[in-house]
A protein has these predicted regions:
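Helix-breaking motifs and short loop linkers at transmembrane-helix boundaries and internal kinks
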Residues: 39, 71, 93-94, 98, ...
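Helix-loop junctions on the cytosolic side of multi-pass membrane transporters
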Residues: 97, 124, 128, 170, ...
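Substrate-agnostic recognition of the 12-TM MFS/MFS-like secondary transporter fold
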Residues: 11-28, 51-65, 71-86, 103-161, ...
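C-terminal transmembrane bundle of multi-pass solute transporters/carriers
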Residues: 57-62, 75, 89, 102, ...
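Transmembrane alpha-helix termini and helix-breaking/packing motifs in multi-pass membrane transporters
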Residues: 32-38, 90-96, 152-172, 245-246, ...
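Helix-loop boundary and gating motifs at the non-cytosolic
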Residues: 1-55, 210, 214-259
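Hydrophobic alpha-helical transmembrane segments
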Residues: 101-108, 112, 137-192, 235, ...
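Short, membrane-interfacial amphipathic segments enriched in basic
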Residues: 1-8, 192-203
Length: 405
């Protein structure tokens, strides 16, 4: 782990990623509470989640192709500019008192575009920097990054909203995103372009689908990811509503509650990063998702804030194992010229969270937020049992794809 942080460009990317993750989780909570304050509607809060994730569903495969062909540094720079511009517009609207829900929805969409653009390019560039032998440690450090951001972002969001209203969080977000932009700007590594720029889009799409579906390991990760994001991650959009309406707490305690997942994830990701050798990546992946789903189910059933906090902490433990191994398995299993495209396929499955977010929003509108969480997670458990049972992820180690010189 120390050796990775000794690499200048990896260290800069890691620092920028930490700031970006803190900003991403912070603006997720701030936007959710802002829309809830403006509309008092659980459905519209869930709809905000849909706007954030629909770009992943629509554009992930395209962004994966770009990662295989374009300058990955340039892609990351464009994403950083999108973050700064979107946040600046919302900040101006909040400062002038002119903000409306549709403004927040559009900003959420553009920030979703940022994530989908950067997702495969960033991970492919990390693989180029560290290689296959250190990719588990690198992805664990990425998970630690996400986890710290997942803790610091909601915590700062709740604290600043309590102290300053919605102005303080957006000023803070501007500072965070500008610093992340500067850190990416000074990278020396641009990343190799392995594929010639002339290509047929639809033949590449077809090849990406065939390649991913014919590889049993990648196919299993994609199927499980699709179920997890549709049924589990989509319910996170309702956490602010559950905190306010079911647990009866304000913005400050809501931020702390949502940060609970990060505490568990940080502990688990640190342990994974310290492992010298990981043979059964798939077992960690599957154990993680099982723990996460069960914890979310008990969170939905909990009537007490301390128990809800504990359940989200345990969900974070599971999420660390799941998310660390998710990209790692894809990167190890895919051939070099197909890594970006395979990650794009993964992004498509992650983007299904938009559909799940819409579904849980509708259920919450008719019943309650906690009922929507419980129903969605329960269905996810039922669907994942056969998906895990018939996959090769638990039975054998992940084989390394052949490198092309």
């Amino acid at each position: 782990m120390k050796g990775l942080l000794a690499l200048r460009d990896f260290r800069l990317m890691w620092a920028a990623g930490g700031l970006d993750n803190a900003g991403r989780w912070m603006d997720t909570v701030v936007m959710g509470l802002l829309v809830l304050d403006l509309t008092d509607s659980a459905f519209q809060v869930a709809l905000l989640f849909v706007f954030r994730w629909i770009p992943m569903l629509a554009f992930a495969l395209i962004s994966g192709m770009i990662a295989d062909r374009a300058n990955r540094w340039a892609v990351m720079m464009v994403a950083r500019f999108v973050a700064v511009a979107s946040t600046a517009v919302i900040l101006a609207l909040v400062l002038t008192g002119a903000v409306e829900p549709w403004h927040v929805f559009i900003a959420s969409f553009f920030l979703g575009c940022l994530f989908v653009m950067e997702f495969p390019s960033r991970r492919s560039l990390i693989y180029d920097l560290v290689g296959s032998e250190r990719i588990v440690s690198a992805m664990s450090l990425e998970t630690i990054n996400t986890t710290i951001g997942r803790f610091a972002g909601p915590f700062m969001a709740g604290l600043l909203i309590e102290l300053t209203g919605f102005k303080g969080p957006y000023i803070f977000l501007m500072v965070v995103y500008v610093i992340a932009l500067v850190l990416i700007m000074v990278l020396e590594t641009r990343g190799p372009v392995r594929v010639k720029p002339s290509y047929s889009f639809w033949s590449t799409v077809s090849r990406g689908f065939k390649y991913s579906l014919n590889n049993s390991v990648i196919r299993s990760v994609l199927i499980i990811t699709l179920i997890m994001n549709a049924m589990a991650f989509s319910v996170e959009s309702l956490f602010p509503v559950v905190a306010r309406d079911h647990l009866g707490v304000g913005a400050g305690l809501t931020g702390i509650l949502i940060s609970a997942q990060a505490i568990g994830s940080l502990a688990a990701a640190t342990v994974i990063a310290s492992l010298a050798v990981v043979r059964y990546h798939g077992r960690i992946f599957c154990l993680g998702l099982g723990l996460q789903l069960l914890s979310l189910l008990f969170f939905a059933l909990s009537p007490w804030y301390p128990l809800s906090f504990l359940m989200l902490l345990l969900a974070g433990l599971g999420a660390a194992g799941y998310s660390t191994m998710q990209s790692t398995i894809i990167l190890i299993s895919a051939e070099p010229e197909m890594r970006g495209t395979a990650l794009g396929m993964l992004g498509q499955c992650i983007g299904v969270a938009a559909v799940g977010g819409l579904a849980v929003g509708i259920v919450a509108n008719f019943f309650s937020a906690q009922a929507a969480v419980a129903m969605s997670v329960s269905l996810g458990l039922v669907l994942l049992l056969p998906a895990v049972f018939f996959s090769p992820l638990v039975r054998r180690p992940i084989a390394q794809a052949k490198e092309v010189a």
